[in-house]
Amino acid sequence: MSVTPMMAQYLEIKAQYPDALLFYRMGDFYEMFFEDAVNAAEALDIALTKRGKHEGEDIPMCGVPVHAAEGYLLTLIRKGFRVAVGEQLESPAEAKKRGSKSVVKRDVVRLVTPGTLTEDSLLEARRHNFLVAYSELRDQAALAWADISTGAFHVMPVARVRLSPELARLAPSELIVADGPIFDATLPLAEEYKIPLTPLGKASFDSTAAEKRLCHLFNVSALDGFGTFNRAEISAMGAVVDYLEITQKGKLPLLQPPLQESEDRTVQIDASTRRNLELTRSLSGGRAGSLLSVVDRTVTPGGARLLEQRLSSPSRNLDVISARLEALDTIVEDPIRCDTLRGLLRKTPDIDRALSRLALDRGGPRDLAAIRNALSQGEDIERALQDPDLPTLLRDAAHSLEGFQDLLSLLDAALIAEPPLLARDGGFIAAGYDRELDEARTLRDEGRSVIAGLQKKYAEHTGISSLKIKHNNVLGYFIETTSTHAAKMQSAPMSDTYIHRQTTANQVRFTTVELSEIETKILNAGNLALEIEKRLYQRLSGAILDSAARLNQAARGFAEIDLVTALADLARAENWTRPRVDTSRAFHVDGGRHPVVEQALRHQGGDSFVANDCDLSPQDGAAIWLLTGPNMAGKSTFLRQNALIAVLAQMGSYVPAEAAHIGMISQLFSRVGASDDLARGRSTFMVEMVETAAILNQADDRALVILDEIGRGTATYDGLSIAWATLEHLHEVNRSRALFATHYHELTQLATKLTGVENATVSVKEWEGEVIFLHEVKKGAADRSYGVQVAQLAGLPASVVARARSVLDMLEKSSREGGGAGKVQIDDLPLFAAAPAPQPKPAQGPSPVEKLLEEIFPDDLTPREALETLYRLKDVSKG
């Protein structure tokens, strides 16, 4: 059976996009057929029907309404699909002009992928949506990444060994690599981080073609003005641009010139450390419970994106950190100005994403209004920052908001206060802005009154008070008088204006050139008004895009001001302090607190967070605190809080402490917590060892290392040996600043042998057989871990706790007697010695001793009487 012309067209288009679902536009619906329909119906939970036959089989079909397509697109993208959007390129009427059986022209206008989204409904407003390309050329490798929704474009050289931590830092939505060996090598990493991986042909990564592509995009003859790039960097950037040309069908987004980064500009933080410290995502994968969720007080999407970027990439440039802290000082010290700025920023829309949609021709009147409203707020923000003593960072940000008076005046005059979403709906141009549009609207909305006004005009002109303007389907609009006025109307000078149309038994009908023109205008007024508005939309959009570079700078200015004021508001509310950051190797924190735990305790209405000091300030070599103490005492919290304080300080924020002196940190490593990796065949202990190996092989003398209970996942002596050797390696080889928490109390002896190791412990107090956690860190070593008491608190059966106590007593006794815990024989520990727990005896009356105690009133006794009472108690107790 031959296929229909429509289905033949569908199959032809689908053949070009075999790896994507094809949204095939048919009127008000996007239809899907064959396997696409089956997959989409299941993913979207919509009805699967059929339409016609192909090769004797029913053709599966499903569809989604055009007006609701974005929601369905979001679902499909999140489930890992790519979608090719095929639109109608002409109307059915236009198709018929080419022949009665002609099929409406259709083609794919866009390939929707996770890394190429621009619509607000498909994006997280407060997060970047990065498309990343990785390229390897001979002995060079590089990453390039772009967010087409904001125009951000970055590149950096990166060795393959550093690919994992960089992907963890960027958290891209999509990764593109050359098909072949690089794709195969990168696939496990993409699967681990759940990043959609897209292979491209090697031609997309050709550095020579890439250079030409980039020069054409930025309208330059050479890339030297943007930086000195190696061939791998050029290749990666070119691949990003080529992929955008493929997915956007030639409509390139408004990318900013590439910003070159390098590994030595930011603190190196590997993937496991980011996960363990919960910088931007908690261990559960959500935002809640992360450091970002606690510190984020930004009020604009751009400010929120900048905060996440800074938190993910703490700086190693002292000048940059100092500039950020200086700006923060200014706003912290001026709370009134801070509140004023935050109030203005709350009304500031997202310029970046509005600008990007306009550039890709996916914008609408609300994007024009977003630019207008932002520029209007920008004028007030700039005035609020007029101060000759303003720090450079704030002064530059304020300056970026200047010089938009002409554009703002244009948009103010042209747009209504709250425009509709789509340009095709019309009604967004303000009255009085365009005379032709006003006339069209008047004719469209007030046609009757226009005709009535014209009728009055003609009645006065002819002197015929009974003159009427009427309408019928044959003549359209016409002027009608009684036949008694026929001679007058058909004689000069009236006949020069009034043109005879028809004579009936009692009436004579005329028209005028003016009436004919008005009739045409009335009939076409609606369409004309819409066309004029579309034309004006394009003109206004063009005016905005002409200022795109300056608007991008303004967007960065808004984001910077928002971030500074948000951090200032946070510092005031949470009593944070300005850290001292320098190039020393100091690490001294007074009264440090864990920002996430502190806030959680407050929300739960629990105890106040116990602040603690930390001093890892080496004179020369390593500085390591060996931290011992019971479970649940707060060791892991203490470790993490100091790492977070370092991150906050080097991103340019105040910190949760009474005082902090942070010598520049180059790397941050954290081995905290326990988890297995079953998908890769790794046990908990193996994961721990892999992460520890990475630390020992990479940490330098400016690293901050956080290690928690190394060696716990294996036999006691094996674990102790590994922890011992690890501590020595950190001290002698890495020479890092480190916090090392352990339950191996034997390690505390190393403090007497290694000059850079100091013992510290988390205090506890025992009361009537129970352990009370004080959460105070002090110098010294713990003598025990209180594991049995913690087990009791956790709710282990009383018989198990009792049995554990008896075994522990036996082991400790053997150790004291010199035999060592390992010498205890199983026979020395009778089976089931503590099980089951004895039943409580029936309640009895008070003993003689208790009766005597009840009769004693200590405050009434003289010293001699007290002594005599003690002797009496002793006699009674003997019976």
Swiss-Prot record:
Q: Which GO terms describe its molecular function?
A: ATP binding; ATP-dependent DNA damage sensor activity; damaged DNA binding; mismatched DNA binding
The record's section on CDD domains has: ABC_MutS1
Q: Which SMART domains match?
A: MUTSac, MUTSd
Q: Which family does it belong to?
A: Belongs to the DNA mismatch repair MutS family.
What is this protein's function? Answer: This protein is involved in the repair of mismatches in DNA. It is possible that it carries out the mismatch recognition step. This protein has a weak ATPase activity.
NCBIfam families attached here?
mutS1 (TIGR01070), PRK05399.1 (NF003810)
Q: What is this protein called?
A: DNA mismatch repair protein MutS
Originating organism? Ruegeria sp. (strain TM1040) (Silicibacter sp.)
Q: What is the lineage of its organism?
A: Bacteria, Pseudomonadati, Pseudomonadota, Alphaproteobacteria, Rhodobacterales
